[in-house]
C-alpha cells in the first residue's frame, strides 16, 4: 500500500515537470511562429535597413546665362564628407579626429549628427573638401568608421560677389524645413541633402533651377561603411534660365562702384554703399544691377561658417539688401524732371520766360546752396544748372495736387512690377500722406520741398531708371525685367519674356523735347555735370542730384541716358552718404557708359569742387508762418 502511494506521488511529479516543459516548448514555438511567419516581414525589413542605406544624390541646379550665353551661375563637382548613421552613439575620439582633419569644431559635427531625424540617411558634414584632405581621410579610413566621401555638384558663382543680391544664394534643406515639407506633402521630392534657393533668383526660380534628386541604395558593413551598390536612381538636372544681364557691363559697373567708393572714402567722405542699374529704355531689359556692399554666395554653397555669418549679419550697410529695388531715398534734383514736365505741360511757364534767382525764393526763405544767386534763368538753363529757386516757383505755380498726379505718370510711389522679390514702392509726398501718418496740415514750404524731390518723397534707383526711360524713349513705360528665357530640360526654349508696355506718358512730344534739351545741357559746359563729361565722345543727357539725409551726410544721385538723340541705355547711380551727386554718383555713371560704348574716359575731368558741380538747395524753415518739416530735410544748404 505504501509502495503504491509512493508510485503515485512519483508519477505526479513527473506529470508536473512534463507539463512545465511542454508549456515552455509551446511558448517558444509560438514565439518562433511569430518571428518567422507573422512578423517575419517586419524583422526582415529591419535587418535590411541595418544592412542597406539609401544615399541621396543631389541634382545639379540649372545654369544662369547672361544675354550673350556666358555662364553667370553654374555648378561644379566637389567632394563632400558625410557620416553614415549606425544607430550607435558617436565615438568622441573618432569625432575629434574627423574634426581635426576638416578643421571644424567637434561640437559642430556632434550637433549635425544629433539633429539628424531621418533614420539611416547619410548626414552631410562638410562640402567642397580639398583633394589633400580627401587623401588624408582615405589614409585614416580604418579610424573613421561610417565616414563616406562622395562627389556632388556644388553651386558655383564664378564671379563671387558680383550681382550677389540679384543671383541670391542656396543652402541645404534643414531638418525643420524637411519635417515641415513632409507633413505638408508626404510625397515631396525634397529629401535630406536637397539644395534649395534661399534668396534672389535662386529662390524665385527654385522649382525651375532645382531639378530632381536621385539616389543609390548601398550595402554597408557593421561599421556603416558602404561595401556595395545595390540600386541607383539617376538625377535629373534643373532647367537653365537666361538673363538680360550683360556680364561685361556688369563687371564694369561693379568696378566703377568699387573704385569710386574707395576714392570717396580716401577723401574722408564716409560713403556707405551704392546702387547702380543700367536698363534698355526701349525694352525694359536690365543690363546691369549692382548693390554695394555685396556678399559671396559661394560661402553659403559650401556651408557658411559662424564667423562668416556674423560678419555679414552684423554689417550695418546691409549686404543682403538689393538696394536697386528695395532702397528708398529722397530723389532730390532728378525729380525736377517731373516738376518741369508738369509746369510746361500745364502752361504754368513757357520755355522762354525768365525768372530771377536772387539766392532765395521771394515767398518763403528757401535758399540756394551757400546763398548762391544765379540771376535770370529760363527753363533750359534752370534745369541744366539745377536751380532750386526756379523749381520752388514751379512747385508754387503747379501746386501739390498736380505734382502728385504727374509723379504718378512717371511711376513714383508705385512698384515697377519687376519680377524680383522685395521691391519697394517708394512714396510721393502729399497732404493725404501727411494727414494719414502725422495727422497734420500741409504747408506751402512742403510743396516747395516736394518740387525738388525732398519732403516725404522716396524713390528706388529702379524707379528712377523707369522714370528716365520714359523721358528717353518718347513716353513709353516698360516693365523692367531680368529673365529673358526659361529652357526645357533639353535646352529648348520653354518660356520667352520680352518688352511689356505698361502705358504711355500723357504729355505732348514738344514738351518732352524741351525737357530732354535741358537734360542734354546738364552734361555740356556750364551744366552741373559739364566738367564730368568734358571731352566724352558720346552725347549724354543726365541729371545730378544730392538728396538730404536726416541720418547723416547727403546721398548722391546721377541719372543719365545716351546717346541723346537715339537712346540705347539708361544708367542710374545712387551713392549712400556720398555727398554731391556730380562728384559721387556721376563718375560711376560715366564709367558705365564708357564701358557700354567702349570709349575712353578722361578721369581728370572729375572735379567735385568746381562751380559747375554745385547744385543749389535749402532745407525747411519757418518763414511766413510755415511749419518745419517732420522728416528728411536737414535745413542745410546742399549741392549737386
Say what each PLM segment does.
Residues 1-304, 328, 401-411, 531, ...:
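Periplasmic/cell-envelope proteins involved in peptidoglycan metabolism and beta-lactam response
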